[in-house]
């Protein structure tokens, strides 16, 4: 899905959503980017890409490169939220990223440091994937959104989110979760310190887990006020201001 004005010389803002999402998840911030060409990608197993599968981070990075080529996008900024942020970090560190001008990550985990942590996470995600395949999706999502990272969501917001996310196909999301488990992601923190392109790490001010990760690994943090893990949904105006300021005045240390 594309959005905004397209000028031949202007680079694109390419957006990658989180698990259970789609390109439509970026709708709250679109009014603030009417003058900016945007590509809202549906990741494998999600939205219009529900029937598309992927094996691992390397393949989804290649799929992203192919999508950009199909769209004729040669120069772009890459923005990813949560799962999309992890894919964006992998693409910047390990993928074929000619034409990529900068990286923007919102609440994405840079990776687990030890093999033991990664193995434990693979098993953890496999258990969730089994639930998404076997249980009624609304029932599984009730438990999914009780996780600590979603603590800032109130009961009304949680029910709205579950109703929206229940339109997904559980088995397709499960396959994507297993292929891109945090346990299968390389530990990217050190690589991120030495990127040759500008990089910012967006995080809701009340997202304690990811604020802590940003401090632990020295990520270039930009906090978004009055927001938790999903900052672009919680405070789109402040979020868009952070993004636009960075796009206008990127700094590479």
UniProtKB/Swiss-Prot annotation:
Listed Pfam families: Abhydrolase_1 (PF00561)
EC number: 4.2.99.20
Alphabetical GO biological process terms: menaquinone biosynthetic process
Gene3D superfamilies found in the cross-reference section: alpha/beta hydrolase (3.40.50.1820)
Enzyme class: lyase
Keyword terms: Lyase, Menaquinone biosynthesis
Signal peptide per UniProt: none
Family: Belongs to the AB hydrolase superfamily. MenH family.
Function: Catalyzes a proton abstraction reaction that results in 2,5-elimination of pyruvate from 2-succinyl-5-enolpyruvyl-6-hydroxy-3-cyclohexene-1-carboxylate (SEPHCHC) and the formation of 2-succinyl-6-hydroxy-2,4-cyclohexadiene-1-carboxylate (SHCHC).
Protein name stated in the entry: 2-succinyl-6-hydroxy-2,4-cyclohexadiene-1-carboxylate synthase
High-level lineage: Bacteria, Pseudomonadati, Pseudomonadota, Gammaproteobacteria, Enterobacterales
């Amino acid at each position: 899905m594309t959005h905004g004005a397209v000028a031949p010389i202007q680079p694109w803002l390419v957006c990658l959503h989180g698990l259970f999402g789609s390109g439509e998840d970026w709708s709250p911030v679109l009014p603030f980017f009417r003058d900016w060409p945007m590509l809202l990608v549906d990741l494998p197993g999600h939205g219009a890409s529900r029937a598309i599968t992927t094996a691992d981070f390397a393949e989804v990075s290649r799929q992203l490169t192919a999508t950009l080529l199909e769209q004729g996008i040669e120069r772009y900024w890459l923005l990813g939220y949560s799962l999309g942020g992890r894919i964006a970090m992998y693409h910047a560190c390990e993928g074929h990223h000619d034409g990529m001008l900068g990286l923007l990550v919102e609440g994405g985990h840079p990776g687990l440091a030890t093999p033991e942590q990664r193995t434990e996470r693979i098993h953890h995600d496999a258990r969730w994937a089994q639930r998404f395949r076997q249980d009624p999706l609304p029932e599984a999502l009730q438990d999914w959104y009780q996780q600590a990272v979603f603590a800032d969501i109130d009961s009304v917001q949680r029910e709205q989110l579950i109703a929206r996310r229940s339109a997904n196909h559980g088995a397709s999301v499960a396959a994507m979760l297993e292929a891109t488990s945090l346990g299968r992601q390389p530990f990217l923190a050190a690589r991120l310190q030495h990127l040759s392109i500008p990089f910012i790490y967006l995080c809701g001010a009340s997202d304690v887990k990811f604020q802590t990760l940003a401090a632990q690994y020295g990520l270039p943090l930009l906090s978004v006020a009055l927001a938790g893990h999903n900052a672009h949904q919680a405070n789109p105006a402040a979020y868009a201001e952070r993004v636009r300021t960075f796009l206008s005045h990127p700094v590479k240390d």
